[in-house]
């Protein structure tokens, strides 16, 4: 019997500040060209750097696609590696977005937990991708920056009960080009899907015995 295709949603961000071309969206477009194989329906979206749009769009994406996984990709001017974020944070949002707006509460979800971890083992993903010998360094972080990246990640983790991931990429050419970033994203997401499948297999096995 043919396995049902999995839906995977991957988002990048639009321009903001000095990032007139956002490396995250360029990387996601490269990933779209490469695809994630015949068993995955890949849906990509560019997200504006706007708090209120994020609060509206993230739940809508989960409702529309019922995805196996959502991966958000953002650019960090400080990054020199491709960075896997372990968690999103609820509070501390003071930076203005592209609409010159900032949440009055400075938080994602009032009365929500301080932080939410992804259910994906980012250390395992990092180790597995590193062994593939890609020409891209992959590292781990626990601080997505308290701006739209972190805000988006927390919103998605809250919506999905942890079934989301966030990947920070450096600006284009510092040091990686679009093709390298796209291939790194593909390898990372394939490992994430594999780990999710393994963990679900264990859960199903436990339920049967």
UniProtKB/Swiss-Prot annotation:
It is found in: Cytoplasm. It holds the Pfam family Peptidase_C15. The active site is at residues 85, 149, 168. The keyword Lyase does not apply. Keywords: Cytoplasm, Hydrolase, Protease, Thiol protease. The keyword Protein biosynthesis does not apply. It is an enzyme of class 3 (hydrolase). GO terms for biological process: protein catabolic process; proteolysis. InterPro entries: Peptidase_C15 (IPR000816), Peptidase_C15-like (IPR016125), Peptidase_C15-like_sf (IPR036440), PGPEP1_Cys_AS (IPR033694), PGPEP1_Glu_AS (IPR033693). GO terms for molecular function: pyroglutamyl-peptidase activity. SUPFAM superfamilies: Pyrrolidone carboxyl peptidase (pyroglutamate aminopeptidase). Its EC number is 3.4.19.3. It catalyses: Release of an N-terminal pyroglutamyl group from a polypeptide, the second amino acid generally not being Pro. Inhibited by transition metal ions including Ni(2+), Zn(2+), and Cu(2+) and by sulfhydryl-blocking agents. One of its GO terms (cellular component) is cytosol. Removes 5-oxoproline from various penultimate amino acid residues except L-proline. Monomer. Belongs to the peptidase C15 family. This is Pyroglutamyl-peptidase 1. The gene is PGPEP1.
């Amino acid at each position: 019997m043919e396995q049902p295709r999995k839906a995977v949603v991957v988002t990048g961000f639009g321009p903001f500040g000095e990032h007139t071309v956002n490396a995250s969206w360029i990387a996601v477009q490269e990933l779209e060209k490469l695809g994630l194989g015949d068993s995955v329906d890949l849906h990509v979206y560019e997200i504006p750097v706007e708090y209120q749009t994020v609060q509206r769009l993230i739940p809508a994406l989960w409702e529309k696609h019922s995805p196996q996984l959502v991966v958000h990709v953002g650019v960090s001017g400080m990054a020199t590696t491709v960075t896997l974020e372990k968690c999103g944070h609820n509070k501390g949002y003071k930076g203005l977005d592209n609409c010159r707006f900032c949440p009055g509460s400075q938080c994602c979800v009032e009365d929500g937990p301080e932080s939410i971890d992804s259910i994906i083992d980012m250390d395992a993903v990092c180790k597995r991708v590193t062994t593939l010998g890609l020409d891209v360094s992959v590292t781990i972080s626990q601080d997505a920056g308290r701006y739209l990246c972190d805000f988006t990640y927390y919103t998605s983790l809250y919506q999905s009960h942890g079934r989301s991931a966030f990947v920070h990429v450096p600006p284009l050419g510092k040091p990686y080009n679009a093709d390298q970033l796209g291939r790194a994203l593909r390898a990372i997401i394939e490992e994430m899907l594999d780990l999710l499948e393994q963990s679900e297999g264990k859960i199903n096995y436990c339920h049967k015995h």
